[in-house]
Amino acid sequence: MKCVLVATEGAEVLFYWTDQEFEESLRLKFGQSENEEEELPALEDQLSTLLAPVIISSMTMLEKLSDTYTCFSTENGNFLYVLHLFGECLFIAINGDHTESEGDLRRKLYVLKYLFEVHFGLVTVDGHLIRKELRPPDLAQRVQLWEHFQSLLWTYSRLREQEQCFAVEALERLIHPQLCELCIEALERHVIQAVNTSPERGGEEALHAFLLVHSKLLAFYSSHSASSLRPADLLALILLVQDLYPSESTAEDDIQPSPRRARSSQNIPVQQAWSPHSTGPTGGSSAETETDSFSLPEEYFTPAPSPGDQSSGSTIWLEGGTPPMDALQIAEDTLQTLVPHCPVPSGPRRIFLDANVKESYCPLVPHTMYCLPLWQGINLVLLTRSPSAPLALVLSQLMDGFSMLEKKLKEGPEPGASLRSQPLVGDLRQRMDKFVKNRGAQEIQSTWLEFKAKAFSKSEPGSSWELLQACGKLKRQLCAIYRLNFLTTAPSRGGPHLPQHLQDQVQRLMREKLTDWKDFLLVKSRRNITMVSYLEDFPGLVHFIYVDRTTGQMVAPSLNCSQKTSSELGKGPLAAFVKTKVWSLIQLARRYLQKGYTTLLFQEGDFYCSYFLWFENDMGYKLQMIEVPVLSDDSVPIGMLGGDYYRKLLRYYSKNRPTEAVRCYELLALHLSVIPTDLLVQQAGQLARRLWEASRIPLL
């Protein structure tokens, strides 16, 4: 029973998402027993009526006390509410079935806010304009937009429950060096170069191209003029691709047999694979007691013949181009459910990602994303940038300058002479004069002249309040220019994009290159790394997740427990039980890291659960540990999609090591409890070293 709502301070609904159970509870609450023929209010109106007291009380407390509540539960703990104010929009997440904790709900809100930024760019900084974008006056457009974000939230919830990479928020590579190299060459020659040398590209510049097999990254290539893509942005792109072309095997256990058939909120069920209330050692359920008594199959402990000293869990094919057939036989069940066919391509989309423009960092630069499906589960993604991208840098710098000026004005009254002497103001004035002269828009010209008259007048300088109002007006007009140039002219609205025949050419060439590999890739994506490769050296190890937080990449054995695809643990309750343990460990590790703990080791039933976070230099030498910051319960959630916690943690650690490159790593492990703890810790160190060496395999 779940709900997400975005509303204004006046309780106007800007977006909502509910599951069927929550809608049913609303129907019962607003049902008219006296006149059954009377039509019920629209779902949007029901939500507004239900949550108006919460919204108004929260905003009133913020206005009167400069503080408000961020989380509360209803009587008897039936419903849990989490609230967060982003700008002028209040985000509310509700759970009524005890399957989501406060941290889960807060993470969902931050992810939704991040998805808004990816889709609307810097328009999100202006409350008035983002309200217009989220609630267009045309009803059909509004329904289409809301259904898009409802579908994204449903996809995110599904992937977080079923895919390890979304559970820990990191990129998972499909490990096969020779195939990766082949794909990189193909991306360079047949995608990036083919597009950039085409006379019909219309000024669009191909920057990045990558191949996905389900949610795993096979290969990635960037042009020489492109800046690096943040791991958080790349993970968000994988989410968008999975929303467009969901993997059948990850959606097969959902309540709706075909979740893509209808994308409205009425058809977006969300199930949780684990309960946050049963993660402690004493919180075992009856199901846990039963599965604790299972003995692991004997063949699980019998390592297969080692494929070679270089192997780190994946078999490397040295010669011949195509994999041997015995590799395909090991997962024939996977192939039966993933019969390749060619989905219909989606249209190009305008998205906003952080990048460098003219050697300067710029947040939320407009890109165009082309998702070209090769076969079911295998997708080619191309990112291009239009010639107008430098305008985004100029607008971003100007809006940032006015935001800093607003901050200074709010700190205290500034006399005119003192304001003029600020280096920030002089630089901002020079940049704005140049921009206004080049743009020539009458409205922003008059507003800028009005601002200069108040800010730089020696005889009659404006007050701080007047300058603040003028700053806000200028920022809104700059934001409107940004919206006009990058949202109104988006490819989906008829804006410029690559011609269709060029997209078809790229798609066809990549299909030809990978035709012999498609079946192998679909199998490999489900059994990327096998535990058998590690059991000889690490007896008692059941599962692990290793994450390089500097690059945002993870390594973990496959963990599938659906009815049609499975890992080495099989398809029964044992696989589901181990998966539940791993997901609970991920959540518990985050909670302890939030409180400043970087090491966690505890016994739960027949298992030892452990978590380690540490820092190294580029040579792989472990660095001295520090006390990591302790965060409040309502802080930005730990991960990449909600706020990139690890990038901030690396900056925090690097303050005392300005001349040394610092890297951050995490290891989560599940062992049998018969293993002594000192041996477990020793194994963790050896496992981390082995995985560090394996992760040196280049992806780019």
UniProtKB/Swiss-Prot annotation:
Residue ranges of the region described as Disordered: 249-317
GO molecular function: guanyl-nucleotide exchange factor activity; protein dimerization activity
Keyword Repeat: yes
One Pfam family from the record: Fuz_longin_3
Start-end of Low complexity biased regions: 275-286
Disease with which this protein is associated in UniProt: Hermansky-Pudlak syndrome 1: A form of Hermansky-Pudlak syndrome, a genetically heterogeneous autosomal recessive disorder characterized by oculocutaneous albinism, bleeding due to platelet storage pool deficiency, and lysosomal storage defects. This syndrome results from defects of diverse cytoplasmic organelles including melanosomes, platelet dense granules and lysosomes. Ceroid storage in the lungs is associated with pulmonary fibrosis, a common cause of premature death in individuals with HPS.
Assembly notes: Component of the biogenesis of lysosome-related organelles complex-3 (or BLOC-3), a heterodimer of HPS1 and HPS4. HPS1 cannot but BLOC-3 complex (heterodimer of HPS1 and HPS4) can interact with the GTP-bound form of RAB9A and RAB9B. HPS1 and BLOC-3 complex do not interact with the GDP-bound form of RAB9A and RAB9B.
Annotated protein name in UniProt: BLOC-3 complex member HPS1
Organism: Homo sapiens
Source taxonomy: Eukaryota, Metazoa, Chordata, Craniata, Vertebrata
